[in-house]
Design a protein with these regions (language model features):
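ABC family nucleotide-binding domain
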Residues: 3-4, 9-211
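Conserved beta-strand-loop-alpha-helix hinge in the C-terminal portion
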Residues: 207, 215-233
């Protein structure tokens, strides 16, 4: 079942008297429950696209259909509801609240939606049950990233958007984070989109979208995604 349809999406930013093209004629479909990787070098337009899919920015051209609704035409209030109810975000930098414990950071996100998952249960799922009462400064980078994932997962998002989620992590911790994201797709049915410049991650995806110079360069589907345990990158 098609969950995301992007049709001729374009995004431009003014710079002086010129317009900078961030996305141009971007078109693709994503099926519900897929794990998708968007690849591209810095400046290719992939983070802009992720922000538009997440309702943090809006397209200037084209359509961005999420579950049949064109979010490019939503009001600011409607976009807020969309982000709250349907979307989870994971970034390279964890954005945890420093004076809240791991559990409290997860609870903070869970409070804004109905039927959220239990914070302790989600922290157990990401291997941090014994660290729930620690503050961010007491956690390693990998542990902080897993708290950030738990915070996103607790909302039970239909769409999980991840911008370079392993970029600041060591190899083993990065694989742990990728396993959690793959499980969200395989076991929870969430549609997971990972933006990265690391092409070595492509084999784990159901679909790989490559961007270059603000446009889609290629789209590939993978009938047999690789297990994280056997991934080398």
């Amino acid at each position: 079942m098609t969950y995301i349809q992007v049709k001729n999406e374009g995004k431009f930013y003014p710079m002086g008297e010129a317009l900078i093209m961030a996305n141009k004629d971007v078109t693709f479909d994503i099926e519900k429950g897929e794990l998708v990787i968007i690849l591209g070098s810095s400046g290719a337009g992939k983070s802009t696209l992720l922000n538009i899919l997440g309702g943090m920015d809006q397209a200037d051209e084209g359509e961005v259909l999420i579950d049949g609704v064109d979010i490019a035409k939503l009001s600011s209030h409607e976009l807020t509801n969309y982000r709250r109810d349907d979307v989870g975000f994971v970034f390279q930098f964890y954005n945890l609240v420093a004076n809240l414990t791991a559990k409290e950071n997860v609870e903070l996100a869970a409070e804004i939606v109905k039927n959220a998952l239990d914070a302790e249960e989600v922290l157990e799922r990401v291997g941090l049950g014994d660290r729930k009462n620690n503050f961010p400064a007491q956690l390693s980078g990998g542990e902080q990233q897993r708290v950030a994932i738990a915070r996103a997962v607790a909302k039970k998002p239909k769409l999980l958007l991840c911008d370079e989620p392993t970029g600041a992590l060591d190899y083993q911790t990065g694989k742990q984070v990728l396993q959690i994201l793959q499980d969200m797709s395989r076991k929870e049915g969430a549609t997971v989109i990972i933006v990265t410049h690391n092409a070595a991650l492509a084999p784990i995806a159901d679909r790989v979208i490559r961007m270059r110079d603000a446009r889609i360069d290629s789209i590939e589907t993978n009938p047999r995604p690789q297990d994280i345990s056997s991934l080398e990158y």
